[in-house]
Amino acid sequence: MNKVRTCWNEGRPALAGWLQLPGTLHAEALARLDYDAVVIDMQHSPIDFGQVAPMLIAIELGGAEPFVRTQVNDPSDIMKLLDAGAYGIIAPMVNTRAEAQTLASALHYSPRGLRSFGPRRPSLRYGSGYLAQASETVVGLAMIETREALANIDEILSVDGIDGVFIGPTDLALDLGHAPLVDTEEAEVVSAIAHVRERAHAAGKRVGIFCGSGGFARVKLAEGFDFVTAAPDLAMLSAAARQVIADARAL
């Protein structure tokens, strides 16, 4: 069973790390912390497929569920990542029901979807019984990042085969005419985020959000979000380095 899905089945939200730097060592190190999942960001990072495959192994070895935010909502890319051992897919810029259906079809085998059969790494974890439980091992979230997606939110949420939606607050803020801040307090953006959360839960779906800090993640967890990421690795590295430098220079 997918660890994130286990959290949800037990009535708990899932907390995830976020990786923008390539490499297996720090991927495993983060996965060994108290994260339920670790997301590899292939959209806004230099990480390519040759790098992501061993990172998926490292995250699984560390004990967290390996997720990927894909470059685009492309079925061939999604299927390849699933075969490489991704157990969660976050697809960017899903604006319509048709685009959500594209994501859903890539996540599931026939008759529920169009995923091609070749689960090289999943079959190592789940054995010969993988096909029968494949849909339960994968979590699929469609990113809500535009005014168009907001207008179509109920249609997107009506798609069978996706678990829910994941809010990208910076692109959403930008498309609504505001500064692209992660932990935004802009009233229109805050209202839009709350609306997505409410519509998702009304539809019986899960809702996640990207957060830039642990404090903001705590707020979103308290608000009822089901899947929350808290600060990417590069931001945490920079913040820690700034603090070390400040401590060293505090003469």
From Swiss-Prot:
Optimum pH is 6.75. The record marks 210 as: Improves activity by CH-pi interactions. Disulfide bonds: none annotated. One of its GO terms (molecular function) is metal ion binding. Could be used as a biocatalytic tool to prepare (3S,4S) aldol adducts through an eco-friendly process. Shows a slight preference for Mn(2+), followed by Mg(2+). Binding of substrate induces a dynamic movement of the metal cofactor between an inactive coordination sphere to a catalytically active one. When oxaloacetate is used as substrate, activity is increased in the presence of micromolar concentrations of inorganic phosphate. The phosphate does not improve the binding of the substrate, but exclusively increases its rate of decarboxylation. Excessive phosphate concentrations negatively affect the reaction rate by removing the metal cofactor. 3-hydroxypyruvate binds at residues 69, 170-171. Its cofactor is Mn(2+); Mg(2+); Co(2+); Zn(2+). The record marks 69 as: Transition state stabilizer. One of its GO terms (cellular component) is cytoplasm. SUPFAM superfamilies: Phosphoenolpyruvate/pyruvate domain. Keywords: Cobalt, Lyase, Magnesium, Manganese, Metal-binding, Plasmid, Pyruvate, Zinc. Mg(2+) binds at residues 145, 171. Its EC number is 4.1.2.-. Homohexamer. Trimer of homodimers. Aldolase which can catalyze in vitro the aldolisation reaction between hydroxypyruvate (HPA) or pyruvate (PA) and D-glyceraldehyde (D-GA). The condensation of hydroxypyruvate and D-glyceraldehyde produces 2-dehydro-D-galactonate as the major product. The condensation of pyruvate and D-glyceraldehyde produces 2-dehydro-3-deoxy-L-galactonate. Can use other electrophilic substrates such as L-glyceraldehyde, D- and L-lactaldehyde and D-erythrose. Also catalyzes the retro-aldol type decarboxylation of oxaloacetate, a general property of known pyruvate aldolases. This is Hydroxypyruvate/pyruvate aldolase. It comes from Rhizorhabdus wittichii (strain DSM 6014 / CCUG 31198 / JCM 15750 / NBRC 105917 / EY 4224 / RW1).
